[in-house]
C-alpha cells in the first residue's frame, strides 16, 4: 500500500507529462499499481486507518501521483450513507470522456489534491455530467454516465493523465467566480 511519502508532489515533472496508454493484458507491475492505488483510497477513507498510517483522505489517485506516467487512476467516491455502495468505484484505464454537458459543476469548497500540499482557494469549473469510456483491470471496456461529484472526481483524475492540475482551471483574477448556471455541489 502507498503511504503519503510515496505520493508525488507538485513540482515533480511527471505530474505535467501526458501519460502513456496502458496495454493489455496488464503486466504484473500494472496489476500491482492498480491494486495499491485502490488500497490507498480504501484505507484513507477509514478514519481509524487513515490516522494510523498518517494518510490524507482521497477519492481518487492517478498513476502519475505515484510517479508512474501511465493512463490509470483509482476512483472511490463513497455514498453519502456509509451503509450504501459507493457512488463510483473502479480503476479507470485509458479513460476517455466521450461526451460532456454544456452545464458546469463546481465544488463549493473548491478542490484539493494529494499531490498539492498547499490550499489553493477558488472554484474549479468542470462539466456537471460526462459519459466516460474506460477499460478495467481485466481489459473490459465500460461506458458510464456520471453526474455531479463522481463526474468532477473523474475529470480531476483524467486531468492528471494529461499533465493538468486542478488549480490550472481556477480563474486567476476572480477565483470564486463560476460560469453562469454552474451547479454548486457541497
From Swiss-Prot:
It comes from the Bacteria. Its EC number is 3.5.1.88. GO terms for biological process: co-translational protein modification; translation. It holds the Pfam family Pep_deformylase. One of its GO terms (molecular function) is metal ion binding. It catalyses: N-terminal N-formyl-L-methionyl-[peptide] + H2O = N-terminal L-methionyl-[peptide] + formate. Keywords: Hydrolase, Iron, Metal-binding, Protein biosynthesis. CDD domains: Pep_deformylase. Binds 1 Fe(2+) ion. The active site is at 157. Its cofactor is Fe(2+). It is an enzyme of class 3 (hydrolase). SUPFAM superfamilies: Peptide deformylase. Signal peptide: none annotated. InterPro entries: Peptide_deformylase (IPR023635), Peptide_deformylase_sf (IPR036821). Fe cation binds at residues 113, 156, 160. Removes the formyl group from the N-terminal Met of newly synthesized proteins. Requires at least a dipeptide for an efficient rate of reaction. N-terminal L-methionine is a prerequisite for activity but the enzyme has broad specificity at other positions. Belongs to the polypeptide deformylase family. This is Peptide deformylase. The gene is def.
